[in-house]
């Protein structure tokens, strides 16, 4: 095995705004500006990474021009997560690499499609491949035209389109497959990589790039509508792509593709979001229902949430694996981590009680029933959820922001909203009466304990601060339109939590906004929805556009936006942000 300095994968992590995502529902890849596939967990979202460069670990798949100087750009196609990396070289050539994870996907097999094309002028490119599931090195490398084959950990590897590749020694002594090739103007080359679990059945006889691209394009066209009827068609299409790309065939939707990306440097606020949060999945279902597009995301959300309610009842967990399993508790990872954070896996939410997740579940079931998307067990699941609220709404819980246990106002109000909507469309006369009565009792008690003398909602009975999450329950029907408590809370959010047009979720201590944490992108879209509901469409559009400005160059959103540095913070892409963008874009066009 030859040592070759050029056989070094891109090692320096990039700013989060420079990454794009390709995904097939079971897993996703972060694509960096130098053609690096910096993050891929295999076989599913919460598995060990096979490409771990994002967090300083081994493994990756790079395709980039061979030249001293080039600048990067990129864009998504109109339908789905098909990404084009684009480079302009110092010699004046323009090169593109069209990239996707093949769809429809299989749970135990990932197929990575890359089509390199010289758009203008000739170009030389280099591809480097190092598949490292769980850190295991590639072994048993063989070439039998048209494939290179190898094994790594518990995975089998096939690589087509790189017949002239050679085995080189990588940075840590492991094997790297390296190939350099030339493209004349207008010429293209397909690279097809298959990573399959050892337990997978016999592989397809042929990894035909043309057929794989055609199937992938067809699948994405069916999943992503034009969205020309929204206030932001391009971003709405991307939101459909993100929500679809994060949703497993098992029904669960990963909250984000990544783990442990810091919200603030070296402050311990870096979490693993590769799991399916009940709340986030409900928000995604609402968004698709609001737009009325292809029902895949809504149908998956309803099926997943219904099954979890019927299985766990009043012990509903806030988050599950995408297959419905238990989320492990947070623990350190062996990876070095993204700069400013130590790597972790698992999530502490697995041990929390979050009342609002039950209320959101009722809202989702009611929305599905209104759109004829209810599961056979939906009515029973609604009864289970309502009973859980009746038994546990007096108990402290972690709440939407997953902090300390309290009687959070948002949690109670969102349950009142869920009960009212379920009573309207899911309950028989007896259930409807009981659920409405419970909603009235919750609202009365919350008004008694959580309304400030000025008439707005406080975060909790023992916390007078305003919270942007308190704008959500009125949007879902917890209170009638025009209710003065909602109006006062909206004004307080504008006065206390908005700076330079960006919205923060709440004030942290006595620090100015933007010091302890970034603007919370979700809250920007929530404020726009609240302003629209209040009849102030012009202001809602301004808020919507400001929130949209906090995206990556690819159009993806993370959880937070650092306004001062114009940087993304936290895991990416954050599903619930894209869900609220889609819902807001749909409602603003009404």
Give the label of every model feature segment.
Residues 1-590:
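Acidic, mature catalytic/reactive cores of soluble proteins
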